[in-house]
């Protein structure tokens, strides 16, 4: 499945499950080295509820973001922006 097919499928699923605006929860696993956690957090506005927790060995940080999203397109755009950060796993 190509990236575009994946995002089209995700859009369909999001529209089936959510009505907008909605509080959407993003979850990411981010390598703790460097400023990658900061880069992920910086992609969301100050109104977002962001929590993070480092793994027991400190190699990774889980980042959870709860934020009001206005459309499935806006959610997909955030996923695409985060995907540009090397090593981030999107759950």
Task: Kindly give the residue locations of the regions a language model identified.
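Long, contiguous binding/interaction regions
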Residues: 1-62, 68-91
């Amino acid at each position: 499945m190509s990236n575009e097919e994946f995002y089209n499928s995700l859009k369909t699923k999001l529209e089936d499950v959510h009505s907008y605006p909605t509080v959407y929860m993003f979850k990411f696993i981010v390598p703790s080295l460097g400023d990658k956690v900061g880069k992920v957090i910086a992609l969301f506005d100050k109104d977002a509820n962001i929590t993070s927790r480092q793994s027991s060995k400190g190699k990774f940080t889980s980042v959870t973001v709860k934020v009001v999203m206005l459309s499935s397109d806006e959610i997909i755009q955030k996923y695409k922006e985060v995907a540009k950060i090397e090593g981030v796993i999107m759950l």
